[in-house]
Amino acid sequence: MKNNADYIEMKVPAQPEYVGIIRLTLSGVASRMGYTYDEIEDLKIAVSEACTNAVQHAYKEDKNGEVSIRFGVFEDRLEVIVADEGDSFDFDQKQQDLGPYTPSHTVDQLSEGGLGLYLMETLMDEVRVQNHSGVTVAMTKYLNGERVDHDTTIKNYETN
């Protein structure tokens, strides 16, 4: 298997109105890779949560903060890294405060402030968090579902 990848990097102001731009870019990349509609929606939710956390918690009132997003496009997976240089938090402690989760728990039983991390871990195949000099969230979604054929044309439909 090849380890070749294409990388797409974005740096946006840490403001809520820019999260939509990240979602649109992600949707385009994931669609081009062949993810299903449901997988793309899962990706958008998880990445939006990571970006929203950076916007809301990293810089507090500082309007000059930035969020960096990197998409690693591999043959078998999409890796998304969301990073900020703002305030860090203790991920292990936060996870301990939140969990454990069981299927019998309903969403309204989850601890306040931890739903984003829970969603990221539930919707993505891998999630890693580093909290040195800001917070970096690395998420991976493997491509294993049906691929969307992007070479489909009207002519292809007419011949079938």
From Swiss-Prot:
Keywords: ATP-binding, Kinase, Nucleotide-binding, Serine/threonine-protein kinase, Stress response, Transferase. HAMAP family: Anti_sigma_B. GO terms for biological process: negative regulation of DNA-templated transcription. Changing A14S: In strain: IS58. Homodimer. In stressed cells, forms a complex with RsbV. The predominant form of this complex has a stoichiometry of 2:2 (one dimer of RsbW is bound by two monomers of RsbV). In unstressed cells, forms a 2:1 complex with sigma-B. It is an enzyme of class 2 (transferase). It comes from Bacillus subtilis (strain 168). One of its GO terms (molecular function) is protein serine/threonine kinase activity. It catalyses: L-seryl-[protein] + ATP = O-phospho-L-seryl-[protein] + ADP + H(+); L-threonyl-[protein] + ATP = O-phospho-L-threonyl-[protein] + ADP + H(+). CDD domains: HATPase_RsbW-like. The keyword Glycoprotein does not apply. Coiled coil: none annotated. Pfam families: HATPase_c_2. InterPro entries: Anti-sigma-factor_SerPK, HATPase_C_sf, RsbW. Disulfide bonds: none annotated. Negative regulator of sigma-B activity. Phosphorylates and inactivates its specific antagonist protein, RsbV. Upon phosphorylation of RsbV, RsbW is released and binds to sigma-B, thereby blocking its ability to form an RNA polymerase holoenzyme (E-sigma-B). Induction: By heat shock, salt stress, oxidative stress, glucose limitation and oxygen limitation. This is Serine-protein kinase RsbW. Belongs to the anti-sigma-factor family. The keyword Transcription regulation does not apply. The higher affinity of RsbW for RsbV than for sigma-B, rather than a difference in the concentrations of RsbV and sigma-B, is the driving force that is responsible for the switch of RsbW to non-phosphorylated RsbV. The kinase activity of RsbW is directly regulated by changes in the ATP/ADP ratio. Its EC number is 2.7.11.1.
